[in-house]
Each structure stands twice: as C-alpha cells, then as structure tokens.
Amino acid sequence: MYKLFKKLPLIYILSIFIFILISSEHQYPQGWDELQSNEEWELVKKTDRVQISIKQLNVSPLPAFKAELISDVNSDKLAEAAWLVAKSTEVFPNAYIIDAGVYYKQGVTSYTAFQLFDIPFLSPRLYQFNSIRLGNSIHWNRADTISSSYNPDKILLPPVNFGSWEIQNLGHQSIIIYRVCTDPGGDIPIWIVEQANQRYLPLMLIDLETYANKKIVLY
C-alpha cells in the first residue's frame, strides 16, 4: 500500500484524505446502507424514459423510492444542477416547492438547507436537511439540530427524510439515480403519497435534466 501511495501524485493523495475526512463528518441515518443497496427493489412504474422502484425500509411506514433516467446531458452539469438547492423552485418547477435556500455552508461541499413544499390539499411541509457532495453524488439527511427560530410559523417538519442523487457516466450518456426515504408526517394515507411519488418523480428527473442542459455552464 505504501509503494502504491508513493506512485500517486501528491494532490491525488490529498484529495483521498479530504474525501474521507468530509464523509466521516456527515451523519448517516439508520437505513442508509439499505437504501443505497441495489437489492430488493421492486419496479412499479416505467415510462419511456424513467423507471420507478420501491423498497420497504424499517425506518419509515412509507416505502423508499428509486428513480432512474438515462440522459444525453453531461454528468457534471446534472450534478451541479442537483446541488443548487437555493434554486430548487427553478430546477424543479413541478415539485410544489415554493421556497428553498441554504441556512449555512460548511466549505464548498456541504451545507444545511431547506425546501418548503406546498402540495394541494395538504398542509405545507418544511424539509430541513444536511447535504454533502462527494464528486457527482449528493447525500442528504434530515437536520435535527436546527434552531426553532428557523421555523417561526411552526410548519410541519417531516420526521424522516434522507436520500441521494447519484450521477454516473454511461459511455457518451449519463444515468441519474435518485433515492429517497421520507415520511412526510401528518395524517396522509400511504397510498396517496405512493401515487404522488410515482407521478412526480419522473417529472422531477426530467426537470433536472432540462435545467442542467439549458442553464448550467461548466468552466
């Protein structure tokens, strides 16, 4: 191992240690490894471009969802668009996000942020979460230590919320993989949430692709 490291450029070795340090500070929830595993997913919907699968995790009464889309858009552009949480209302115009922003940043690869959802016929939900970017992957988990002063109107806070964006190169194309486990809280029939996710997740991935293709410029 030592001989291998001697052959690597110093900047590459430093990047490895920085990656380990940053990822070790991010708090991962119970059920994270199960969400990321490719096993036991059940395909429930397939459009001409998007596949939706579900898996039941013990940490939520609702199934976790995985959405996948193959895109001609550059993977770096897609990841950059997914990282722009403050522009969520522009990136995801069909997601019923009415406000979003960053509470505070920890460097360029980590932030604590929020998204305010106002879905018709339901009470608004305020999602507060910690996000970390690892290359073209983004991991997030519900933030438990945010002051109540950031929620003066006492909007409902979902008790479970974690997931990831993963953008992979696929030859001359990219594949977007979105995984999420959430319990929005409140008295919502499970079947309504499941149907809503099956309807809006495909739109969300296509909206991400559209924004990345039209708005993101790589330097």
How would you describe each model-predicted region?
Residues 11-20:
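Bacterial N-terminal signal peptides
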Residues 26-219:
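Eukaryotic helix-grip
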Residues 2-12:
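N-terminal Sec-pathway targeting helices
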